[in-house]
Amino acid sequence: MTEEQVLNTHNAEILLSAANKSHYPQDDLPEVALAGRSNVGKSSFINTLLGRKNLARTSGKPGKTQLLNFYNIDDKLRFVDVPGYGYARVSKKERAKWGKMIEEYLVTRDNLRVVVSLVDLRHEPTQDDIQMYEFLKYYEIPVIVVATKADKIPRGKWNKHESIIKKKLNFDKNDHFIVFSSVTRDGYDEAWDTILAEL
């Protein structure tokens, strides 16, 4: 069964932005959180999966997402875009505030079914990437690691880069790892199939 048969992915809209749990939607729709460092390609990932060009705003300015952005998908599912981490030009105080907001959502939100943790296929995971993965494993939150920007690397080198990332993350072989490109749409079907299997 494809995602199109399960839900109309094009029927999507940004629902609300929230700073804390009092602002979260009050229902039982399943949620998929998307986490990753600034400019890893989260907005492009969302837009590609939902078949929309500008639903999630892509920005040349890292650290632009400062709230939890909830996207309603066909009234059956929500994506939750969490603030990009690891951006140096944000104050320590602001980063700490974001960290608390993200942690509160990830640890306390009953609607959360899985976290899509995005990393850049071209580079080794940063310390922030590693800490995010360790955090999710510690709290036993289901995680899918998606390595973005695959189109920037020759296809023949994908396996090598995947191995490097998995080693640095101390990757759990029971988790899913998907190589993805918003340009070529590589990984599109696998991403949807894996997400839907977690709901």
Curated annotation (Swiss-Prot):
Cellular component GO terms held in the UniProt record: cytosol
InterPro entries for this protein: G_ENGB_dom, GTP-bd, GTP-bd_ribosome_bio_YsxC, P-loop_NTPase, Small_GTP-bd
Record bears the keyword Flavoprotein: no
Domain of life assignment: Bacteria
Cofactor: Mg(2+)
Molecular functions (GO terms): GTP binding; metal ion binding
EngB-type G domain residues: 28-199
SUPFAM superfamilies: P-loop containing nucleoside triphosphate hydrolases
CDD domains linked: YihA_EngB (cd01876)
Alphabetical UniProt keywords: Cell cycle, Cell division, GTP-binding, Magnesium, Metal-binding, Nucleotide-binding, Septation
Residues bound to GTP: 36-43, 63-67, 81-84, 148-151, 180-182
Binding positions for Mg(2+) per the UniProt entry: 43, 65
Family: Belongs to the TRAFAC class TrmE-Era-EngA-EngB-Septin-like GTPase superfamily. EngB GTPase family.
Record HAMAP family: GTPase_EngB
Function field: Necessary for normal cell division and for the maintenance of normal septation.
Name of the featured protein: Probable GTP-binding protein EngB
